[in-house]
Amino acid sequence: MTWISEDTWQSEEVRVDFVTGCRNPRDFFWAFITLLGSVGFLLVAASSYLHKNFLSFISSEFDSELIRFLPQGATITVYGTAGLFVSLFLWLTIFWNVGSGYDLFDKKRGIVCIFRYGFPGKNRRIFIRVLINDIQSLIIQSKKENKKEGRYLRSGVLYMQTREQGAIPLTAVDDSWNPPKIAQKAGDLSKLLRVPIEIF
């Protein structure tokens, strides 16, 4: 029983891959930037509507008379409000840790269990159970980049192809991994599950 990477634990017959989900630095960055931008827009809109400088902490020379409330201030209010809703959505996905979970590969019992957290409600906990004998192959859906020297694999997403449930993603579909990392995971799983790897 050893940790083979920061998010993978493996013994001879069991492997557990832990999935981070929405609590990664990129998601925190975008949630913070969206919140900051939308609050800035709303402060400018409030300054133009009330003819007061709510941005004095940034610049004492800001003249609220430069931006009339109709139509510029009203438009900025709409953008600021929309930004607040987007920011709220991003912060809630981080709070609920949507997409996090684990992949359990148990050769001894002959099963693969995939668990993910979703949004609150009926699908808050998503649990998929697959028999190892039902797995046909591992699929790397690659994203290639054309350069002068030729085509290169830029990133990819790993799927597990099953007979009954079709292709099940093992990595986040919107978060493509770099080639060495996805090749390493696919190779390790192929060896453990004794299934071929297909690249598309």
Curated annotation (Swiss-Prot):
It is a multi-pass membrane protein. Its main location: plastid. The keyword Phosphoprotein does not apply. The keyword Transmembrane helix applies. The gene is ycf4. This is Photosystem I assembly protein Ycf4. Belongs to the Ycf4 family. The chain crosses the membrane at residues 28-50, 76-98. It is found in: Plastid, Chloroplast thylakoid membrane. GO terms for cellular component: chloroplast thylakoid membrane; photosystem I. HAMAP family: Ycf4 (MF_00437).
